[in-house]
C-alpha cells in the first residue's frame, strides 16, 4: 500500500516512511530504495526523516549513503535541541549509533571512535539512565559494536561502564 501511495505521490512523507519500514531487510530493501532516496528531501527539518533512509542503505551495503543519512539525522536533531532549548538527552542517539556502525563497516575506525566519544561526553554531561534510557542503551551498543567489528577485544578494558550505568546484556559478556 505504501509503495502504491508513494508511486502516485512521491512527496507523501508517510508513504515514504512506511515503505522504508516495510522493506527494512536485505532481501526486500531494494523495493524501498526510491523511497529512501526521496524521504529526507520531503521532510528536511525532521531528524527522523533524515536518518530513516539509512535503514535501506545499510541493508544494501550503501555505506556512504548511510553515513550521509545519519550525519544529517544527527545534525538535524542537534539543531532542533538547540532551537527548542531542550536537554541533550533529546538528541537523536539512534542516528549517532547508526553513524558509528556505518563508519565501522567502512573501516573508518578513527571516525567511529570520534562518534563514540560524543556519546561518552554527553553521558558525562548529565545524561543518565534515569532521565533517558535511549541514550544509555546506545552507549553499550556502540561499545559492543566497536569490540566485535574491530576484533580489538582489549577495548572493553578501556571503557568500564560509566558511573551509575549498568551494562546491558550484550555488553556484560565482554566485561567478563
Specify the residue positions occupied by each region the protein language model found.
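Residues that mark the junctions of alpha-helical repeat units in TPR/alpha-solenoid scaffolds
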Residues: 12, 46, 85-88, 92, ...
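Solenoid-like repeat scaffolds
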Residues: 6-8, 37-45, 75-86, 120-131, ...
